[in-house]
Amino acid sequence: MSEIVDLGLSFRTLSSNITPQGVTAHYGGPSPWRGFRTDHNRCPSIVRSWHAYHLSKGWSGLAYSAVVCPHGTIYKGRWKGKRTAANGTNPGNQRSYAVCYLAGDNDPVTEPAKRAFHDAAHALGQPLRWNHAEWKSTSCAGDPIRAWQRAGWPPPAGTNPTPQPPSKDWFDMA
């Protein structure tokens, strides 16, 4: 399970008017990494800066339910039971949680990020279902996320091993 981090973001009043039917994947616009993708220490400050930017626009705060970073950490945004402001349409915000990848449009979706997307969706109680462009005409969620979606949102290899059936010895212990 990916680590879920609560940065203690302060929100203005958030609506609980949401009837989620899935999770919409987003990316954060231009890449924030500029060659420093390995610097996980930058992730919390980038999430906080997005929150401050959204507040400056008069919004209630970070528009996303959660943010996942390339290193596999999930940062709580509005979280479960709160309406998003990220999907671009009233139906999108009503029917879907929004999980944003802390990356740009051409940044690859790392294996830890794929695990974090799946874990965030599980924690929100909904399946990964849409990319942002399915709600509104936009370049978001970028080609790498769209390609991952077209492939069926596969989780990283080796993260969901099939357990071996019990051996004869296990049954003989009874």
Residue ranges of each PLM-predicted region?
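N-terminal post-signal-peptidase region of extra-cytosolic proteins
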Residues: S49-A52
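Extended, low-complexity, turn-rich repeat/linker tracts enriched in Gly/Pro/Ser/Thr and Asp/Glu
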Residues: L55-W59
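Basic/polar, cationic surfaces and motifs that engage anionic cell-wall
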Residues: M1-T38, R42-S45, G61-L62, P70-M173
